[in-house]
Amino acid sequence: MRWALAGASTIAAEHVIDALRAAGEDVAVVQSATTARAGEFARMQGIAGFGTDLDAILADTGIGAVYISSTNEKHHAQALAAIRAGKHVLCEKPLAMTVAEAAEMVAAARAQGVVFATNHHLRCSGSHRAVRGLIASGRIGRVLSLRLFHAVHLPGHLQGWRIDNAAAGGGVIPDITVHDADVARFLLGEDPVSVVAQMASSGMGQGVEDSVMSVWSMPSGAMVMAHESFTHPFAGSGLEVHGTEGSIFATGVMTQQPVGEVALVTASGREAVPYPTHNLYTQAVADFLAAVAGKGRPAADGRDGVASLAVALAVRTAAETGQRQMVNYGGAA
């Protein structure tokens, strides 16, 4: 299948293009805001076509799918254009700036009969799938709590709009909290009901938050605590799941690489948990292509993207107001 890229992004260059090509897909054209940017990206990535007019690119009936990795405020319009042109869409998170916009994208894809997926890469990780399996099999009993620690140092080449442009969707909440919301939903199989939160600009953010802590209430009664930041170079990342019969400790697993350690602790002692170390993006592409072929579903579909955005927006509102916020899924939950 021939693909168009909407956005000449770092994630496309470092991960997604290689994953598409590894699956035998043809990355045919890239769109960006300027001809110079699109042309340079195309040259560097060995892509034959480039341009600034997405509608013209979408008019090519030979294009079967679009990967969207532009800045966040562009996702909604670009996805709707691609969907209405009959293309399958893999869209970066957050899907949009509002839950209503994201829900509109999902509804449009359903009406058009195309696959619409959210690129939540962490649920493609072998480590996360192993943790989910342990929980589902009852190895730790009833889940009591989940702790997500995802405070990192944002590399210089990724800062830009993420640390100073609220209009483009900057800030750590749409960048990382949205991922952690998906992780919690994936692992626990339920949607957060309400959240409390506190956020700060702790040295990197200029007009946007660069650090946030939040606690989420789950329907089962489990509690989730999440910590995300752009300003913590030595914190490490990971997750802990604690249950009535055991605990799971997964360290170094909140990354784009298939790395980290997973351990299960029960009354019998501590044991290392093996997991497959496949490429996360290769898995995401494989699941997407299976869905296109009618043989499965994407790793994270559009509804998953709506839900993760809803949680992230509730976290921001809770932090802004200092009050507990119910999560508004816009009818998608």
Go through the PLM ranges and name each one:
Residues 1-45:
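N-terminal Rossmann-like dinucleotide-binding module
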Residues 5, 65-68, 290-333:
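C-terminal helix-rich "cap/oligomerization" subdomain common to oxidoreductases
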Residues 11, 33, 274-286, 300:
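Active-site loop of classical SDR/Rossmann-like NAD(P)-dependent oxidoreductases
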Residues 12, 51, 91, 116-118, ...:
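Hydrophobic residues in well-ordered beta-strands that form the structural core
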Residues 45-108:
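Beta-loop-alpha module in the N-terminal Rossmann-like domain of NAD(P)-dependent dehydrogenases
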Residues 104-121, 141-146:
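Rossmann-fold dehydrogenase core element
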Residues 122-205, 322:
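Predominantly a Rossmann-like dinucleotide-binding segment in NAD(P)-dependent oxidoreductases
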Residues 182-255, 282-295, 330-333:
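Contiguous beta-strand/loop segments that form the cofactor/metal-binding neighborhood of enzyme cores
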